[in-house]
From Swiss-Prot:
Record flagged with keyword Transferase: no
UniProt entry tagged with the keyword S-adenosyl-L-methionine: no
PROSITE patterns recorded: B5 (PS51483)
Gene Ontology molecular function, alphabetical: ATP binding; magnesium ion binding; phenylalanine-tRNA ligase activity; RNA binding
Alphabetically ordered keywords of this record: Aminoacyl-tRNA synthetase, ATP-binding, Cytoplasm, Ligase, Magnesium, Metal-binding, Nucleotide-binding, Nucleus, Protein biosynthesis
Name of the top EC class for this enzyme: ligase
InterPro entries (UniProt xref): aa-tRNA-synth_II/BPL/LPL, B3/B4_tRNA-bd, DNA-bd_dom_put_sf, Phe-tRNA-ligase_IIc_bsu, Phe-tRNA-synth_IIc_bsu_arc_euk, Phe-tRNA_synthase-like_B3/B4, PheRS_beta_core, PhetRS_B1
Name assigned to this protein: Phenylalanine--tRNA ligase beta subunit
Length: 589
């Protein structure tokens, strides 16, 4: 859940009254949000810093990512104001999208807010809304990027193009020197704020740019705007550009940016649209589209799901508290037509309308009832049931379970285990830290790191993990597959090979899998071990585990165990000898 920090005085002013902390906490609770913190009495707050309220917002309520949206939603909920009716002014400019943008960011939208009256607090809220949208819905600008400009210094019509880096020259925001696009990545590689976005366009032969009629670069999404169109507290006309790889999220973002701050326009709730000309992909239209979306909601469903028996007129009246306009369906007496305003992008189904009805009615007002039928419980997946049995049996044998991170570094997954990259590991596209680069394809790195962090404990250390590893599998819909593995390690004064071997035999006994002593002379179901050279283990002290699931079939390699190689122990900073086993449990499901 995003946490929004609002100026306490400004929020209460917008709500029309002062609240005690307890009163406001109760209001938030009734609405379905949560007051996380009131900094009024925070000893760490500096005297020059105004008190603020930190409010946890549901992740899908993009209309509440700023003070203006929170105040508007609560005012409508308290019936202090009606749902705003947004008005589109005549369009005066256009944005033409070139076909080349399909190579990198194919969609764009724009809008203009006229006569906006900003002050320092409103300006900060405007910038904060962009940041919150970028961090949440926009997925750190990978899906959508927002640019805001002082329209008074720009000249339309505008074009959205994809140019070669060397063809781009402009002065970036908060800079004084002009730079060439070919130097952009180098220029911002050490920027704490912008370097995290460079990967989005780093491998593209063309960069997206928005140009005005004079061919001046207004924006180079998703990285930086131009200095010449920089907005300030004194800006009165704001041009908003939005570019995206996802058209649905593009429309949501442009609607949020315009509806939230159109309240400060000279004529409140008015927005000047922009004609988007995109003939190459059939996306020519006018943005923003502020027409309400109509849903059909079954009256019986709304009542039964909430445990109510309300007439349709009362349901319609209650839904107005949630900014929804409902009326009886003239063609079906059992349903309502519910009109959802453009800022309520979280409404996707009649179940969302049902939830809003429950909030408007008040969850505290719902009758306390018990289910009419006996409560049932879900049946566990077989792989989970098997994993739980394994956990218990290994723990009974005197081993302690650990739960390391699912992610690890590329080196930990390969080089530190003395393995080469086989391209089977699922890699993160833009990892934030070196420790979390890939999804582990073995449980061993996590187990070894756990021993490293506990190497000062009394020896021996006997720990295990039963969990999933992941592999790339391009034959599947999600192009990955999971396997449930068991991994255990013994670290002590001696290698403890016999301890690991004994644990393997104990697990196989528990799985009712017999040991086959001469697999070449037998077609029986069971398991056997064969000597193997594995670079992770000491030469001559390693064996592979094979399992024959059905009579007469070939054995399948399901695991490996042995004494860990000294170079592996050195990489993980271990000074004790150690042995480990790892087997794939999925064949027993």
């Amino acid at each position: 859940m995003p946490t929004i920090s609002c100026d306490k005085e400004e929020l209460y002013k917008a709500l029309g009254r002062e609240y005690t902390t307890q009163e406001f906490d109760e209001l938030c609770f009734q609405f379905g949000i949560e007051l996380d913190e009131d900094t009024t009495n925070d000893p760490e707050r500096s005297p020059s810093e105004r008190p603020s309220l930190k409010i946890d917002i549901p992740a899908n309520r993009y209309d509440m990512l700023c003070l203006e949206g929170i105040a508007q939603a609560l005012n409508v909920f308290n019936r202090r104001m009606a749902t705003p009716q947004y008005k589109l002014l005549p369009s005066t400019t256009s944005l033409t999208i070139s076909p080349e943008t399909s190579e990198i960011r194919p969609y764009a939208a724009a809008a203009i807010l006229r006569g906006v009256k900003l002050d320092p607090i409103r300006y900060q809220s405007f910038i904060a809304l962009q940041d919150k949208l970028h961090a949440n819905l926009c997925r750190n600008r990978t899906l959508v990027a927002i640019g805001t400009h002082d329209f008074s210094v720009m000249e339309g019509p505008f074009t959205y193009e994809a140019l070669k880096p060397e063809e781009i020259n402009f002065v970036p925001l908060n800079q004084t020197q002009e730079i060439n696009g070919s130097n952009l990545l180098e220029f911002y590689k050490d920027s704490k704020h912008l370097s995290r976005y460079l990967h989005i366009i780093a491998n593209s032969p063309r960069y997206p740019v928005i140009l005005d009629a004079k061919r001046r670069v207004c924006s180079l999404p998703p990285i930086i705007n131009s200095e010449f169109s920089k907005i300030s507290v004194d800006t009165r006309d704001i041009f908003i550009d939005v570019t995206a790889t996802d058209k649905t999220k593009l429309e949501i973002v442009v609607n949020m940016m315009t509806t939230m701050f159109s309240c400060y326009c000279e004529e409140p709730f008015t927005i000047e649209p922009v004609n988007i000309i995109s003939e190459h992909n059939g996306c020519t239209r006018v943005t923003p589209n502020l027409n309400p979306t109509c849903f059909k909601a079954d009256i019986d469903y709304l009542n039964e799901a909430c445990g109510l028996s309300l007439p349709e007129d009362e349901i319609c009246h209650l839904l107005t508290r949630m900014m929804l306009t409902a009326k009886p369906n003239p063609n079906d007496s059992k349903t309502l037509l519910v009109y959802v305003p453009p800022l309520r992008a979280d409404i996707l189904h009649q179940c969302d309308i049902m939830e809003d009805l429950g909030i408007a009615y008040g969850y505290d007002n719902l009758k306390h009832t018990y289910p009419a039928h006996s409560v049932t419980f879900g049946k566990p997946f077989e792989v989970n049931r098997l994993a739980d049995i394994i956990r218990n049996e290994v723990a009974y044998a005197g081993w302690s379970e650990v739960m390391p991170f699912i992610l690890c570094s590329h080196d930990e997954n390969y080089a530190w285990l003395r393995k080469t990259d086989d391209s089977k590991a699922v890699q993160l596209a833009n990892p934030k830290t070196l420790e979390f680069q890939v999804v582990r394809s073995s449980l061993l790195p996590g187990i070894l790191k756990t021993v490293r962090e506990n190497k000062n404990h009394a020896l021996p250390i006997k720990i295990f993990e039963v969990s999933d590893v992941a592999f790339c599998d391009y034959s599947r819909e999600r192009m990955t597959r999971n396997e449930r593995h068991l991994c255990a390690i013994f670290a002590g004064l001696n290698s403890g090979f016999e301890q690991i071997h004994g644990l393997l035999d104990r697990v196989m006994l528990m799985l009712n899998t017999k040991r086959i002593m001469n697999p070449k002379d037998s077609d029986a179901v069971g398991y056997w071990i064969e000597a193997e050279d594995d670079s992770t283990f000491f030469p001559g002290r390693c064996a592979a585990v094979y399992y024959r699931k059905d009579f007469g079939t070939a054995g399948i390699r399901v695991g490996v165990f042995g004494v860990l190689h000294p170079l592996v122990l050195e990489k993980f900073e271990l000074t004790s000898a150690a042995s480990a086993v790892e087997i794939d449990l999925t064949l027993w499901v």
